[in-house]
């Protein structure tokens, strides 16, 4: 595919809910206008499944395209020594590497949780992740900014959105 026809790709991973929990898939009890907007203006997956509906193995499967029995992340990586030392998918090819090889500019902003989070992973031009694991939604936050420990104060959603928007604005024109 030529560069002129190559689509932009922006992925939002959300945690801890089933498809049935979102209004865009028919739930009328939940109000989520931003997710509804994204679903109506982008690609909406209507036949997608996870091999393991738990945070860490689901993320590892998304990034590698492999099953937990293949990539080795079988359960949630606890916010403890395990999250700091578990190699997770560090030694495996991830989707960001493949996209980089195809000429894309890649970034991760937010929760990695498929291996150690403090150091940037192969394939990502930009890396802004939780230092270890997700923190309270408001207050002092610890992040890994390109591998450097930084602390920020505020709402997680605002801090992460600002980082993502900066990455999108600062990337080279293509």
Question: Model-found features: residue ranges?
Answer:
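Formylglycine-dependent sulfatase
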Residues: 1-174
């Amino acid at each position: 595919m030529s560069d002129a026809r190559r689509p932009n790709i922006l992925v939002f991973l959300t945690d801890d809910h089933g498809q049935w929990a979102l209004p865009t898939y028919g739930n009328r009890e939940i109000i989520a206008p931003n997710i509804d907007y994204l679903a109506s203006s982008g690609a909406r997956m209507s036949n997608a499944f996870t091999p393991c509906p738990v945070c860490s193995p689901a993320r590892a499967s998304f990034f590698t395209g492999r099953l937990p029995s293949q990539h080795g992340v079988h359960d949630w990586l606890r916010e403890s020594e395990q999250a700091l030392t578990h190699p997770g998918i560090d030694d495996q090819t991830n989707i960001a590497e493949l996209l980089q090889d195809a000429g894309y500019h890649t970034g991760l902003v937010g929760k990695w949780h498929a291996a150690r989070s403090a150091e940037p992973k192969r394939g990502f031009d930009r890396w802004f992740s939780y230092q270890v694991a997700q923190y309270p939604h408001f207050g002092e936050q610890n992040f890994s900014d390109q591998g450097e420990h930084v602390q920020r104060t505020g709402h997680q959603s605002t801090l992460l959105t600002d980082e993502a928007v900066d990455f999108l604005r600062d990337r080279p024109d293509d």
